[in-house]
Amino acid sequence: TITVHMNRKSTVFTHTVVLKLGSYSYTIGTGVTDNISLDTDRIASSLYAQMPNSNEMTGEIAVTTYSGSTVIGTSSCAIIAHVVNSNPTFDVAYEDSNSKTVAITGDNQHIIRNNSTLKISVSNAQALNSATLKSITAVVNGNAYTGSLNGSTGTINVGVVNVSHDTEVTVKLTDSRGNEGIRKITV
């Protein structure tokens, strides 16, 4: 919530209060004579759309003062808009994509050390609040592997892995703001 405090120099003055961020402007109130507040949740999507590649952006609150219909003057103050609760979301699964080892185990969820080929699949990937998806990576045994994204899905071909016991894999989805969604799975 933003609250704009008025300090009227005359009881005949009224004010128009406008929020500006990038190319977006929103009139908070006209004919204002006292303090006025704005619940920014009402316009959050429009604000987020102005900063698809950043988690914060400087804007302003502009107050134009009138005496009747005559403009007395305009003053403004800077504000900083912040992106919150906007880490990308996704689902993740893994499989052994080596048909020969799957034929031995009978289950692509079982990994044979130094033989199975680990493939990690991402689905339902979504960037939030006007961001776009940028990259996906997985860390296995301390090694990072970069995958490819195609819309809301992605694939990370890790390859043959040297794991002899249950191993935690960290999968990270990064958006255009640098925000990260992280999921952990055990293979």
Which role fits each region the language model picked out?
Residues 1, 84-113:
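Short, compositionally biased P/S/T/A/G/V-rich stretches that sit at domain boundaries
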Residues 13-15, 131-136:
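Solvent-exposed loop segments of extracellular immunoglobulin-like
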Residues 18-44, 139-155:
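Solvent-exposed serine/threonine-rich low-complexity stretches and specific carbohydrate-binding patches
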Residues 42-58, 157-166:
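Surface-exposed, short loops/turns at beta-strand junctions within beta-sandwich domains
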Residues 59-61, 169-171:
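Hydrophobic beta-strand segments within extracellular beta-sandwich modules
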Residues 63-65, 173-175:
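Conserved structural position at the C-terminal beta-strand
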Residues 70-82, 179-187:
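Edge beta-strands of extracellular beta-sandwich domains
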